[in-house]
């Protein structure tokens, strides 16, 4: 990620912020990544995860709408998700 000074951030904190994650279909994909999200947003409601399987059923897309409290929190969450072995893409 680029180092943008906080005063130039386009996001106002706190705010609800959607994060989309894609990976190969796996029975524990949603649960495993929900646990990662909860490390950065303990108030996150796991029931709010939006799940969309790919047409072929080989991949799963998840949307987590987290309560973003700082740029550092979002950057750390993105790094944790991006580095997870089950994750192909984070948007």
UniProtKB/Swiss-Prot annotation:
InterPro entries registered for this protein in UniProt: UPF0250_YbeD-like, YbeD-like_sf
Cystine pairs: none
Secretion signal span: none
Record Gene3D superfamilies: 3.30.70.260
Domain of life: Bacteria
Pfam families: DUF493
Assigned protein family: Belongs to the UPF0250 family.
NCBIfam families: PRK02047.1
PANTHER family noted in UniProt: UPF0250 PROTEIN YBED
Protein name from the UniProt record: UPF0250 protein BPP0168
């Amino acid at each position: 990620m680029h180092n943008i000074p906080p005063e130039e951030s386009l996001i106002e904190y706190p705010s609800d912020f959607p994060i989309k994650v894609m990976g190969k279909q796996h029975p524990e994909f949603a649960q495993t990544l929900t646990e990662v999200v909860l490390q950065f947003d303990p108030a996150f409601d796991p029931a709010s995860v939006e799940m969309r399987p790919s047409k072929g059923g080989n991949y799963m897309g998840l949307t987590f709408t987290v309560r973003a409290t700082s740029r550092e929190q979002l950057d750390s969450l993105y790094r944790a998700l991006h580095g997870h072995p089950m994750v192909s893409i984070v948007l």
